[in-house]
């Protein structure tokens, strides 16, 4: 597996490239042009500037997260073709800079949802938290105001230019069903996958976070079954998945290791993180350690190892520890700890494989 690390750019992240390069085994930066609104073409010169910055510190920029999709595409409006053409030009520009994977999502309005950005744990750390009952009772606009109280860093999917149109967007999605959303995703993929394939880029959709409908908005990327359906919409290696163990793991019924075995050749990018799910449906993000959450991180890494996974992996959201001031979920310390935990499992599996091979050779002798 190729270890990468998400970075929000110069002046937009508490973590520096110099710090990231000190984490063992990190070879690339997961990045985006976060100031570019959804639907706009990414200028090649801006892409190349990020490449220059990262390469100065020894990193590649082969994974982009995310090239956000304009809501008109998700809504299936007549204007979607204009935005799809811009998206295709962005794919072409990214290919010119050496990008290999584009992570994106097809979630209406909100890219992800939490009710608390700094929920305190018994050990004194804080983490992203989802209170199931609260989502069913709170006004979505009140939740937006609550999230907006933390202006230190813009949260992906919660950009001010997106949230200022919240009322209009909720009205627009009022009659959009899950099947409508599937149809609109199919339309989008049929038009961009040929471009991605020609450019040598793999599109990797991110599961919905959390993996169920929120505020009456449809969600469709929620399970192994939905991943299978997505891959059949356009059955091509360029149409893939960003398998996120934290997003899918919020539903304990999702068997993530089984998904890895089923779709291994269509997973170019993996997010590995843990969550602790409570009986009432609440969940909190934990350390990456298997014992600390509900998700079997050891089993997931083993599944990647068994399938010969050679794609990109990043530690996903971390806790906020040691008084670090950072973008919620995206500090340095806990994600660095997560990387070392993942490497520990991976190296152990490599050692087991080597020992087994030696044993077989000695038996033949």
Swiss-Prot record:
What EC number(s) does the entry state? 4.2.1.8
Give the catalysed reaction(s), semicolon-separated.
D-mannonate = 2-dehydro-3-deoxy-D-gluconate + H2O
Q: Which GO BP terms sit in this record?
A: D-glucuronate catabolic process
Q: In which pathway does it act?
A: Carbohydrate metabolism; pentose and glucuronate interconversion
Domain of life from the UniProt record: Bacteria
Per the UniProt entry, the signal peptide is: none
Q: Which cofactor does it need?
A: Fe(2+); Mn(2+)
Alphabetized, the UniProt keywords read: Iron, Lyase, Manganese
By sequence similarity, the record places it as follows: Belongs to the mannonate dehydratase family.
Q: Which HAMAP family is this protein grouped with? A: UxuA
Biological function: Catalyzes the dehydration of D-mannonate.
Record's protein name: Mannonate dehydratase 1
